[in-house]
């Protein structure tokens, strides 16, 4: 079932959370709402779910207006960041909960509930944990159980609010790949909120970039990465170098460069900024030689040694030691303004 929002606006006091937002999501599509904190992505998700009402605009499911439909009637599966499992219920009882609280006229028989819950636990590959309690599960297992519970009521759409935000990095990566595979089996319209750029680009069919209550760009991961529509999108999706210059009659000049800019063919001495990602630079042989052999002159200031656990033995540097820093060769094409790079320190032997 498709989801469509038209001209949604929402204020909380003087704060404008959403400003004339419109979006269409097809059945079977997995869409990421991506943006910084306070951009409106969670508010948009909650309005789609019926947990929040908009000041203006409408929400449509499969072309039918659902704006005024109660949350209990929308048939939406919702997964929260912090699982929201019932601590006093077993895994089986948590997944069965939505089925057992249905109105008597819609409630399945106990045999049907048993079969459905075991099928769902098998789907999320945790049927062997049916008799455990949430406190006995890992964070990743709890999140998969929360997803099984959301699917138990056969939702028309699936909404996930930062579903992996409370998990450690390794588990988060494993679960998001698992979610992608699972979603392909379900064929429902799914929307998930995240502030993790890598997560959105890896998992989603399309990415919706949001900022200050507005949609900045909608596109496939490749489209938003290779063709950012605004400076915000460029900056939010990764490191970028900003080169200030002037555009005139389809040519941009700045930073000692002259580049064709056909989209600015009508410009006359207009200030313009060129955006270049670090990996897009090509270095001449002379520049590569400079990068490979660039060293700092000796310094005589106090420095501190910072090291990883894989280097258990580190010699502390004293004031009289001379320090030389150089870039690793593998990093020579990953420079960006304000970024960081590894350095090799070698105290001069006395």
From Swiss-Prot:
Keywords in alphabetical order: ATP-binding, Mitochondrion, Nucleotide-binding, Plasmid, Sulfate transport, Translocase, Transport
Reaction equation(s) it catalyzes: sulfate(out) + ATP + H2O = sulfate(in) + ADP + phosphate + H(+); thiosulfate(out) + ATP + H2O = thiosulfate(in) + ADP + phosphate + H(+)
Residue ranges annotated for the ABC transporter domain, each copy included: 3-237
Location(s), subcellular: Mitochondrion
E.C. no: 7.3.2.3
GO molecular function terms attached to this record: ABC-type sulfate transporter activity; ABC-type thiosulfate transporter activity; ATP binding; ATP hydrolysis activity
Gene Ontology CC terms: ATP-binding cassette (ABC) transporter complex; mitochondrion
List of residues binding ATP: 35-42
Top EC class of this enzyme: translocase
Role played: Part of the ABC transporter complex involved in sulfate/thiosulfate import. Responsible for energy coupling to the transport system.
Family label: Belongs to the ABC transporter superfamily. Sulfate/tungstate importer (TC 3.A.1.6) family.
Name of the featured protein: Sulfate/thiosulfate import ATP-binding protein cysA
High-level lineage: Eukaryota, Viridiplantae, Streptophyta, Embryophyta, Tracheophyta
Gene from which this protein is expressed: CYSA
